[in-house]
Amino acid sequence: MRQILEHLLTKQDLTREKAFNVMLSIMSGEHDDAQISGFLMALRAKGETVDEITGFAQAMREKMVPVSLDSPAIDMCGTGGDALGTFNISTAATFVVSGAGVKVAKHGNRSMTSKSGSADVLQALGIPIDKPVEESTKDIEEIGLGFLFAPAYHPAMKYAIGARKALATRTVFNILGPLCNPANVKAQIMGIFHPDLTEVQAKVLKALGSTDVMVFHGHDGLDEISTTATTKISQMQNGGDVNTYEFDATELGMARHGVRALY
């Protein structure tokens, strides 16, 4: 870890292999909270690259509990962290998409920044959030919508909890979670908390094997496709190039509203 820290403190990027190895060692419990905290803050100060995030995600995927599906599914989630406290929009959207006939492997957790996370919403509706892998798989295959509760599928994250709580600030883990769907979906819709990360995250998903993705950030600060402002979207279709563009919901005839309408 010392060599990695020196590397980061001198603003040198890690190769994908080095990023993979350091995250694998963290997920294996080889470092204490102080070392992990130092690593996370040095990385944040330097700024994360596509290769670094890809390597980290590959290591986390290696440690996760996998879900095997017989047919394609999509994930719909956000990083959170927009600090606007809206209702859980991505979870509501999953019911619409699933109702339209698209299978959804919803990967999520409890609230970190909003009024409620996907797990909180489902629990309030009386839906069990900690089903065995077999039951969640059956839900996705037969009903068209299943919930994959992140803590149950990423047990190795326990080694980073102490450092994350002590730092109490955004780190690379905030963008890694949505990249590590246990069902290894190839199609994904993702909201992100900063506009500079839409293209980065889309390129990481491409490197991880995704074929169809949309990563977006509303210019009102939302990690959603917004109806209160224009939205920056980075999109990849059929494994092609990542294209970034601006989207305005009013072009589809939707009225502009204030963010407070989403509370």
What positions do the PLM features span?
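Short glycine-rich loop/turn motifs that provide flexible caps or phosphate-binding loops at active sites
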Residues: T10, S28, K46, C77-G80, ...
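Acidic, glycine-rich active-site loops and adjacent beta-strand->loop/helix elements
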Residues: G78-A83, G108-S114, Y153, H219-D220
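Acidic, glycine/proline-rich low-complexity segments that act as flexible tails and inter-domain linkers
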Residues: M1-G85, A100, V104, H257, ...
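Glycine-rich anion-binding loops and their surrounding alpha/beta cores
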Residues: H7, E62-V65, T86, G101, ...
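Hydrophobic pocket-lining residues that define ligand/cofactor binding sites across diverse proteins
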Residues: L43, V97, L205
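A glycine-rich phosphate/pyrophosphate-binding beta-strand-loop-alpha-helix module
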Residues: L40, F87-I143
